[in-house]
Amino acid sequence: MFIKFLHKIFSNRNDRILKKFKKIVSSINQLEEKFKKLSDKKLQENTGIFRLRLKKGECLDDLLPESFATVREASRRVFNMRHFDVQILGGIVLNKQCIAEMRTGEGKTLTSTLPAYLNALTGRGVHIVTMNDYLAERDAKNNTPLFEFLGLTVGLNLPEMSFIDKKKAYLCDITYGTNNEYGFDYLRDNMIFSAEERVQRELNYALIDEVDSILIDEARTPLIISGPSEDSSFLYKEINKLVPSLICQKKEDSDKFHGNGHFSIDEKSKQIYLTERGLVEVEKILLDRKLMKKEESLYSSNNIILMHHVISALRAHNLFTRNIDYLVKDNNIIIVDEHTGRTMPGRRWSDGLHQAIEAKENVTVRNENQTLASITFQNYFRLYKKIAGMTGTAATESFEFSSIYNLDTVIIPPNKPMIRKDLSDLVYMTEEEKINAILKDIKNCIKKNQPVLVGTISIEKSEMISKKLKILNIKHNVLNAKFHAREAEIIAQAGKPKSVTIATNMAGRGTDIVLGGSLESQLEKNMYLDKIETIKRNWKKQHDLVVLSGGLHIIGTERHESRRIDNQLRGRSGRQGDSGSSRFYLSMEDSLMRIFASDKIISMMRKLGLSLNEAIEHPWVTKAIENAQKKVENRNFDIRKQLLEYDDVCNEQRRVIYAQRNKLIDSENIQQNIYDILKDVLHSIIKTHLNFDFPKNTRNILDLENKLSIEFNLNISIKDWLKKDHDIKKENIIKKIIDIAKKNYLNKEIQIGFHNIRMIEKSIMLKTLDSLWKEHLSAMDYLRQGIHLRGYAQKDPKQEYKRESFNMFSNMLELLKYEVISFLSKLDISYIKSNLHLNMNNNSSIVNNDIKMGRNTPCFCKSGKKYKYCHGSL
């Protein structure tokens, strides 16, 4: 009832918005005949006219009707494709900084050309964001003729490109790329050492395809650029050996710390806890292996790292499964995206988990990496002046889009009514019964020439069903992370009669399934004119045969954690008014039901006494499934919200550091900054030492003289000054010391040269800033990991985190000033003068991406230098 009530409210609001926007669609339609009469040249001249009008003070909304009419007419001439009214409606929504929910097959790619063109007129750039490189290349290639016809430039941003090519891509009016690459480029731009290396310009307008996958599903995983840390591979291998001897606590033991097992598993939060018995056992094993001293415990400060390794090893063995969470290929652990089923080469889990899994699978254990720069997608996309997004499934997440990103969700009606039949779920007691029912359904579809798409949640499940089909001699295609290269080809032909396609997490695949198979792909393989008509006739027969059979049939092998992912799978059928059907098969052994469904429901089903292979359709069970999904959705939303709350603290500090960095890089002369810092640092040090019992406390005076000599190369005798003038004030002493320091520094400047000293100042300032920021991020990680313990002291962990991180950040900024002045004060003039011919930037320090780099490999920053001579030198 509550959901229906919400839907009613949302629908009414949605209808009001659509009614308002439909008036704009009408005004665009009225311009259609006028624009059809324009010559190509006149139509193309509109771009220049629109830009001139913007310069004269008009806004984008003023230009929207004419600009959209221009794009529609240009598309008709270039592609022979006219934007439908619903696509125009979608374009208006996207320009209004909203999320447009458009069903699969409604032409989101063509819709995106409308707001992309309009916002590109400002000259500040448009970033079109896709889920993967294939989609970025495909969409850029497909839409470039249209944009170039209208006088706009189009760029493509790919991972393997040099920073010069990336810079060219970002300077284009419209740039295509993936969310990962845009985010990493932002981080890399804040690790450069000269303005010429910066690739991005201002973040103006981001148009995000599959926006729910990017802003919600991937929001829990931050982008991280990291560098190599100390070698601890031996420890991972040793700890891995003790895991088989530890026993997992039985589920019925409610007390996770005092049960009979050695450790307990919380599957909901993916965490593992050692029991008291487990703690004793682990300590005994570590003592036997001489990894821990006798007088120490596992929880002592010296052994925190050991405890971390033990928990990581237990998580690797009990919470992460081969061919579900990761693949083992070429002596590497390759992560599988839990939302899309795609592999993510080069990406590594943090906190030692990746190394623990490497030890578990007996592949080479690579060094841990230290975070050098990181940002979440939530905070990255909030940097844009304007963002919008498209997806086939957004309504269920409308609250999150609104509360976190300030984005309203608008449901765009389909161009043709949706006639797909969504059949009720069938629930079985066991996994085996469920699989038998699925196989029976597949055989029935084949008998009536109906194509079938079977959606699974893991590679393991897809391969298991594939084996069953092979035994039955049923031809089929498997689409999962292992066969990524054939993805587009498999999907293109998934609508052929009798075709059976098994797909792991269909979300974000980006290719429509056409009933009868893809005509375009068949024509591409046969370009002979005499064969084209035959191919078209054969395709028409196949298309009609599939329509007659009921269209594409979707089989869900189990419910996903999110209803939205289920809807994405269903949405593969019934595109553009096509016929189709869908059904989900479930069992009480499914992970969703096992972890989140209540014990009462499971007990009730057992008492029903179902016979073998008998399914149940009961309101209670249906309600239990919905409640289970809501539990997971709410939990995941809380995790994302908490991640954002913590990252917001770091984000404010990140903004300060990056703003300071960019200001430094863009400045040719920071002499005044150095003098100001010099004054602040010396004033603070002198005041601290001379604050107590001056001038009687000779010990403090001696300490000050030593510090000034050692840290700042200032050989000053304050005692002599006091002998000459007994009444000298502290303020006068401070002024005299600062004046001497400035004079000494000015002498260095004269000897080294004005231009050279400016280069040195800039280089030292940047290197010191990066070094301290790296250490600060590491300290923040440690603080974050243990801050929850403050709750036991009746303190709010979030407030404690904010307070401590602020203090840490303030201390870091003070230390930055101190180290810069100390370093500059101790410059070896003779050494510098003899090495002025060397490029100062050779010692610049940035580090590699999540992909671990060798010392002699080309540097991560794409400068062309070896890593050890560029970003790896810090």
UniProtKB/Swiss-Prot annotation:
Q: Needs which cofactor? A: Zn(2+)
GO cellular component labels: cell envelope Sec protein transport complex; cytosol; plasma membrane
Q: According to Swiss-Prot or TrEMBL, what is its membrane topology?
A: Peripheral membrane protein
Q: What EC numbers are recorded for this enzyme?
A: 7.4.2.8
Question: At which positions is ATP bound?
Answer: Q87, G105, E106, G107, K108, T109, D512
Q: Per its UniProt entry, what is the enzyme's top EC class, as one word?
A: translocase
The record's GO molecular-function terms, alphabetically, read: ATP binding; metal ion binding; protein-exporting ATPase activity
The record, for PANTHER family, names: CHLOROPLAST PROTEIN-TRANSPORTING ATPASE (PTHR30612:SF0), SECA INNER MEMBRANE COMPONENT OF SEC PROTEIN SECRETION SYSTEM (PTHR30612)
Q: How does it assemble?
A: Monomer and homodimer. Part of the essential Sec protein translocation apparatus which comprises SecA, SecYEG and auxiliary proteins SecDF-YajC and YidC.
Tell me which family the UniProt entry assigns to this protein: Belongs to the SecA family.
Protein name from the UniProt record:
Protein translocase subunit SecA
